[in-house]
């Protein structure tokens, strides 16, 4: 089984690329989905987050209000580190358990582990990855996509972009780079070529 990390900057198109790999036959493990599961009401991480940030981060339905929590942590490096300290170890353990489950049930699979902050936090060695794909896009495209997708103000967009390492730094650490600055078809062609390379290794 091959286990490859997939990452990039916010709004570079990592989710789009992950779906393309899925369409080609990869098994995709999504850190964002696992991150949502580990902070569901009743979990230890949920209790710690509410304890650290207060009831204001709890929505009407009792789940975490991700928008409110995001506004807090994107404005405050100390708060962001506190949140990461609560969640990252839990997320890592769940991802590793899922990889081991897949190794037992799908030994011939190519597994793409979509971890948005892979190169911002732990690094590929924490997940025993055999390589890292970084999805890149121009900063102005990231800004336009964030505006369209999340309806964020210019200040909020800059805060989110500045909270992550620059995409150029991540690109330097990549084993493979997918440039998502062009059309979807251009991106798909790059993914197809890389998929064939992964299958042949």
Predicted regions and their residues:
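Residue-level signal for inorganic ion chemistry
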Residues: 13, 32, 83, 112, ...
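ATP-dependent NMP and nucleoside kinases share a basic, alpha-helical "lid"
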Residues: 96-105, 110-148
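ATP-dependent small-molecule kinase phosphotransfer cores
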Residues: 33-110
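N-terminal polybasic phosphate/anion-binding patch
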Residues: 18, 28-40, 55, 148, ...
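Well-ordered beta-strand positions
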Residues: 27, 131, 175-176
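An amphipathic alpha-helix signature
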Residues: 46-50, 139-147, 154, 158
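Small-molecule kinase domains that catalyze NTP-dependent phosphoryl transfer to phosphate-bearing small molecules
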Residues: 97, 124-126, 148-197, 201
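Walker A (P-loop) phosphate-binding motif
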Residues: 1-33
């Amino acid at each position: 089984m091959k286990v490859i990390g997939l990452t990039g900057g916010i709004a570079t198109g990592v989710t789009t690329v992950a779906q393309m790999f899925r369409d080609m036959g990869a098994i995709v493990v999504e850190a964002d989905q696992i991150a949502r599961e580990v902070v569901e009401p009743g979990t230890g991480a949920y209790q710690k987050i509410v304890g650290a940030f207060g009831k204001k981060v709890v929505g009407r339905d009792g789940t975490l209000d991700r928008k409110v929590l995001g506004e807090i942590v994107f404005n405050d490096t100390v708060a962001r580190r506190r949140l990461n300290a609560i969640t990252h170890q839990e997320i890592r353990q769940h991802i590793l358990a899922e990889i081991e489950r897949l190794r037992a049930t799908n030994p011939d699979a190519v597994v793409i582990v979509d971890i948005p902050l892979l190169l911002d936090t732990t690094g590929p060695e924490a997940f025993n990855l055999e390589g890292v794909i970084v999805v890149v896009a121009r900063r102005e495209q990231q800004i336009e996509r964030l505006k369209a997708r999340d309806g964020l103000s210019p200040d909020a967009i800059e805060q989110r972009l500045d909270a992550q390492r620059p995409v150029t730094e991540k690109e330097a650490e990549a084993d493979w780079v997918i440039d998502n600055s062009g059309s979807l078809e251009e991106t798909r062609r790059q993914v197809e070529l890389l998929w064939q390379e992964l299958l042949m290794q």
